[in-house]
Amino acid sequence: MSNNNAKEVNAETSAIWDNHVTVPDTPEGFTLRTTYPTNKEGVEVMLEQWEAGSEEPIHSHPGDDMTVVIEGKMSIQFFEKSANGLVPDGERLYLNKGDTGYIKANRIHDAKYIEDCKLVYVHDKAFGFTEES
């Protein structure tokens, strides 16, 4: 909750993190505040909040993306397709407060939120989400 009388703000007190909404058909514990691009070559920016213990299914996005962790701790596991289905591609990556992660377009991954997280998420062009199996 924001405090408009404070001289200084942070992730706990800034109005940036107010007015988040839930979105149908998204994982439990996820809320966001966003604006949608009017320029088809632009980027889409979302301010995301995830509750500790929330998880995103294995998925991909059609554009490159960048995640900045403002508060909390999360992890990402990349996957690749094989004859036996999806298999982990490398070690699980951990992102902590202050870290920035980049994911290439169409790279298959999951996301797990170890602590309550506040994220700035930037997606190249219009956002898309494809669940992978």
Where are the predicted features?
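A short, N-terminal "cap"/entry segment at the start of jelly-roll beta-barrel domains
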Residues: 1-47, 92-93
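Conserved short histidine dyad/triad with adjacent acidic residue
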Residues: 44-61
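A cytosolic small-molecule/anion-sensing beta-strand core signal
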Residues: 47, 70-71, 115
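Short beta-strand segments in beta-sandwich/barrel cores
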Residues: 55-57, 72-78, 100, 127
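Glycine- and acidic-residue-biased ligand/ion/polar-headgroup-sensing regions
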Residues: 63-83
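Short acidic-glycine-tyrosine-enriched beta hairpin
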Residues: 81-105
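Ligand-binding loop in jelly-roll beta-barrel domains
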Residues: 96-97, 102-130
